[in-house]
Swiss-Prot record:
This is E3 ubiquitin-protein ligase TRIM37. It comes from the Eukaryota. Gene3D superfamilies: Apoptosis, Tumor Necrosis Factor Receptor Associated Protein 2, Chain A (2.60.210.10), Classic Zinc Finger (3.30.160.60), Zinc/RING finger domain, C3HC4 (zinc finger) (3.30.40.10). It comes from Mus musculus (Mouse). Associates with the PRC2/EED-EZH2 complex. The gene is Trim37.
Length: 961
């Protein structure tokens, strides 16, 4: 079929409206012409309801659907394409040189040629030839394979497109669902608001109705009275005047106060937008601030972990300086990403209390940390005083700024970020505490290993056994002996001199390491809390814009130019109150000569603290747990303060360490007169209680003086020493001991002030003294089994020391030891303490005239030694059961009663201390005193002399044991 015939057939199957190929063909029932459905529908609906070809009336439903026409048009298209392709092939498949049909493929040249080129052309001599049809089939096969791959790829892409379309549809549906939810929620919120409005209106309408009824009643009454006045004659008015006055009285019986109602507040809580968080900034001395070019910052406003403050230029900023008041809001701490916040700045009209005259500017801006948004031209400076915004009497301007998150969702996000920051800080604190615990455990294990490796010296007491397993039995038997009135015997644990020195050096090194760790923890904690509180000012700045509003401040927020109000550094104010008397020894700079006294006290207290560390590792672990809980409780407020008596180093530091601690304490330890006054008041109360205790002791001593005088210089075998007191006096002495222990705990409550003498050596000495009572009793039970007798004056003095004003805190003397001891052992120790005090009272608790004659074991670096003569006397009298107090030199006396807390301990001079060390080292025989874990301190009331006649015990009972 030629091209013309194909074209004529194609003309038949062409739409007579658009003259294009038929698409969804329709047939006119009148003229049988074919046309596109879209074309005829558009014609019938927009033009006329008739056929465009035959003009016959035609409706859309009358059209005939010609489904066969589409197949015919496709076949015509194929015929046209084939005819065109064949024609083109005939033109292209000819050789350009010979005009012959291309029939050969040169495999060497990769080119299609004719047979003449292959045979006679001369250009393809020796080449490999293949039939053109074969090569064509190979290429068609390859192309079809690739086409199949592309079709598969196309189908995959189509499926992906369909999946994306489904995803788009799902997203739209989800959005529509959220919109419906929001609409429902908003409708419910609106309904709740309508309910609130209805309730408020019901209340108001009830008030209005009662008032309206009363006004209508009064109006009708007035009209009636006026009518009577106009219409009645004089006689009638006189006769009705009583009735009218009675009506008036009835009206006045109801007071006006009954009509005064409580106004209904016009506020409705929004469930979508949070309320504003506001703060007020009062610019005092405004005229003086105008003369400066520096900005003024308001106190910080903490909102959900964000720190906001107002930045005010009293004389204007930039080009408006001298003309306008510039006010900006700064985000000094918060989330790292940019967030939008709504803010409002209000200047209060001070001439009257009308809030409608306040200048209010509000806007919403995107804030970053350190960025300022506000108003460069907030208000004209020349109109401040004239308009009433500047109080000329006080020279003040009051600004109120408010800020909020746009939605509750953003506010919850800010709070979640703040909680994350706090949890991270808490994790850091816990990690540091665990590190300190590990260090403490390592040091304690190292000390225990060194103690186990060094062999004990059993030269004097080879059968000494003071293991922890036998302490319970010893305490019980010793308490029974004290209750029976028998003599108290105490054995002295003896160790080598080099072992004592090694343990003291290790303990002092441990104190230094622990103190440095605690100090690092304290300082790091303060820095992190300062960062969380947002009190640190940001130094970042952004570009400025001198537009009318929403100007970004450009000036650098330097700390030197900031005029701070109400102490922007919050932690500095907190440290002023409780660091005046809590610094390490030698670091106080508030008093003249305090450093010298504190250094001497540190020397006296070093051995006492070392002995406390050697007592039991569980005690220190428990103390550190207490500190851990205390720091967790104070995490949101003040910094954790470790216990000064144990966790703060009391050993003598090197000069370099002292200088470093002085520099660290200079900026955080100012003097505080209020704290000193409070301290003096508490010390006066403690002195009063001590006077009461002394009075009671004097009464009991007077009642027992008859029994003690009868036994002067007699050491017989009868039991007349304590039986003369009778059962009543014995019970009274026992009750007195319990009362004295109770009063000592009360005195410890008064002394327990964390800001007063935290690091006093007396406190550590009293701790060791109170704990040494149990050690002395344990050693006494051990020595009683061997027939040796020693003095219990050291243990009893430790008990009396705990009742003085230098007693240790209750958390150390009662809480910790009570937790470590079993219940049965605790009850035995209580009876033991009370009986030890009874024996000390019965013996008069004599004192020595000089302070250096008092027993203070553990204060010497090498440990207290017993003199040879005193030990010989002790051995000579031990057979008869005599107990004499041994007083080695180098001990310090107890404080006098009238001395204040700052001058309680007046230690010996350096020369005297040297003499003491010289005299102590002069002995060849190493008579060792109690080791550091059992040392104690003795203190006696002033004015009483020591006398062997007052120390009588029953020798029979002691010898029998």
């Amino acid at each position: 079929m030629d091209e013309q015939s194909v074209e004529s057939i194609a003309e038949v199957f062409r739409c007579f409206i658009c003259m294009e190929k038929l698409r969804d063909a329709r047939l006119c029932p009148h003229c049988s012409k074919l046309c596109c459905f879209s074309c005829i529908r558009r014609w019938l609906t927009e033009q006329r309801a008739q056929c465009p070809h035959c003009r016959a009336p035609l409706q859309l439903r009358e059209l005939v659907n010609c489904r066969w026409a589409e197949e015919v048009t496709q076949q015509l298209d194929t015929l046209q394409l084939c005819s065109l392709t064949k024609h083109e092939e005939n033109e292209k498949d000819k050789c350009e040189n010979h005009h012959e049909k291309l029939s050969v493929f040169c495999w060497t040249c990769k080119k299609c040629i004719c047979h003449q080129c292959a045979l006679w052309g001369g250009m393809h001599g020796g080449h490999t030839f293949k039939p053109l049809a074969e090569i064509y089939e190979q290429h068609v096969t390859k192309v079809n394979e690739e086409v199949a791959k592309l079709r598969r790829r196309l189908m995959e892409l189509i499926s992906l497109v369909q999946e994306v379309e489904r995803n788009v549809e799902a997203v739209r549906n989800a959005k529509d669902e959220r919109v419906r939810e929001i609409r429902n929620a908003v409708e419910m919120m609106i309904a709740r608001l309508d309910t609130q409005l209805k309730n408020k209106l019901i209340t108001l309408m009830g008030q209005k109705t009662s008032l309206t009824q009363e006004t209508e009643l009064l109006e009708s009454l007035l009209q009636e009275v006026e009518h009577q006045l106009r219409s009645c004659s004089k006689s009638e008015l006189i006769s009705k005047s009583s009735e009218i006055l009675m009506m008036f009285q009835q009206v006045h019986r109801k007071p006006m106060a009954s009509f005064v109602t409580t106004p209904v507040p016009p506020d409705f809580t929004s469930e979508l937008v949070p309320s504003y968080d506001s703060a007020t900034f009062v610019l005092e001395n405004f005229s003086t601030l105008r003369q400066r070019a520096d900005p003024v910052y308001s106190p910080p406003l903490q909102v959900s972990g964000l720190c906001w403050r107002l930045k005010v230029y009293p004389d204007g900023n930039g080009v408006v300086r001298g003309y306008y008041l510039s006010v900006f809001l700064e985000l000094s701490a918060g989330l790292p990403e940019t967030s939008k916040y709504e803010y409002r700045v209000e200047m209060v009209h001070q001439s009257c209390n009308d809030p409608t005259k306040n200048i209010i500017r509000e806007f919403a801006s995107d804030f970053e940390v350190g960025e300022c948004w506000g108003y460069n031209r907030f208000f004209r400076l020349d109109l401040l005083a004239n308009e009433g915004y500047l109080n000329r009497q006080n020279d003040t301007v009051i600004l109120r700024f408010q800020v909020r998150s746009p939605t509750f969702f953003q506010k919850c996000r800010d709070q979640h970020w703040y909680i994350t920051q706090l949890e991270a800080a808490q994790t850091g604190y816990i990690q540091q505490i665990n590190n300190l615990k590990e260090r403490l455990t390592i040091e304690l294990s190292r000390t225990q290993k060194s103690r186990d490796l060094s062999p004990p010296d059993n030269h004097l007491s080879p059968q000494n056994d003071d293991s922890p397993e036998t302490r319970t039995k010893k305490a019980g038997s010793c308490s029974d002996m004290l209750l029976e009135g028998g003599p108290t015997c105490a054995s002295v644990r003896e160790t080598k001199e080099d072992e004592d020195e090694e343990e003291k050096i290790q303990n002092e090194d441990y104190h230094h390491e622990l103190s440095d760790g605690d100090l690092d923890l304290d300082l790091v904690g303060e820095d992190e809390v300062n960062h969380l509180d947002g009190s640190s000012s940001s130094a970042s700045s952004t570009a400025t814009s001198n537009t009318e509003e929403n100007d970004i401040d450009e000036e650098t927020m330097s700390g030197e130019n900031d005029v701070e109000y109400n102490s922007m550094e919050l932690e500095e104010g907190e440290l002023m109150e409780d660091a005046a008397a809590a610094g390490p020894p030698g670091s106080s700079h508030s008093y003249v000569g305090a450093s010298s006294r504190m250094s001497r006290r540190t020397h006296l207290c070093s051995a006492a603290t070392s002995s406390l560390l050697d007592i039991d590792p569980l005690i220190l672990i428990h103390l550190l747990d207490l500190k851990d809980r205390s720091s967790m409780e104070n995490l949101w407020g003040l910094q954790p303060r470790p216990s000064a008596s144990l966790l703060q180093p009391t050993a003598s530091y090197s000069r370099k360490d002292k200088d470093q601690r002085k520099q660290q304490a200079m900026w955080r330890v100012p003097s505080d007169l209020k704290m000193l006054k409070r301290l003096k008041t508490q010390m006066a109360e403690v002195r009063c209680m001590k006077t009461d205790v002394k009075t009671t002791l004097s009464d009991i001593k007077g009642s027992s003086v008859a029994s003690t005088d009868m036994q002067t210089n007699l050491f017989c075998a009868d039991q007349a020493a304590l039986t003369t007191c009778g059962p009543e006096n014995s019970g009274r002495l026992q009750d007195l001991g319990m009362e004295l222990l109770a009063k000592s705990s009360v005195a410890g409550c008064y002394i327990r002030n964390p800001t007063n003498k935290k690091n006093s050596p007396k406190s550590a000495r009293a701790i060791a003294g109170s704990l040494s009572l149990r050690r002395a009793v344990d050693s006494g039970e051990n020595s009683r089994s061997k027939g040796d007798c020693q003095v219990l004056a050291e243990g009893s003095s430790g008990s009396s020391q705990s009742g003085s004003r230098h007693s240790s805190p209750r958390a150390l003397t009662h809480g910790i030891i009570g937790d470590l001891l079993p219940k049965s052992e605790d009850r035995q120790c209580k009876a033991l303490d009370s009986d030890a005090v009874v024996v000390a009272v019965f013996n008069g608790l004599p004192t020595v005239e000089k302070r250096r004659k008092m027993v203070t074991l553990g204060t010497n670096a090498k440990g207290g030694r017993l003199e040879g003569m005193q030990m010989a006397d002790l051995e000579s009298h031990s057979e008869a059961g005599e107990v004499q107090p041994t007083l080695p030199e180098g001990a310090s006396a107890a404080p006098e009663e009238g001395m204040s807390s700052d001058s309680d301990i007046e230690c010996d001079t350096e020369n005297e201390e040297q003499e003491e060390h010289t005299s102590m080292g002069a002995f060849n025989d190493p008579f060792l005193a109690q080791p550091p874990d059992e040392d104690s301190h003795s203190s006696f009331p002033d004015g009483e002399q020591i006398d062997p006649e007052n120390l009588h015990f029953n020798p029979d009972e002691g010898g029998g044991r």
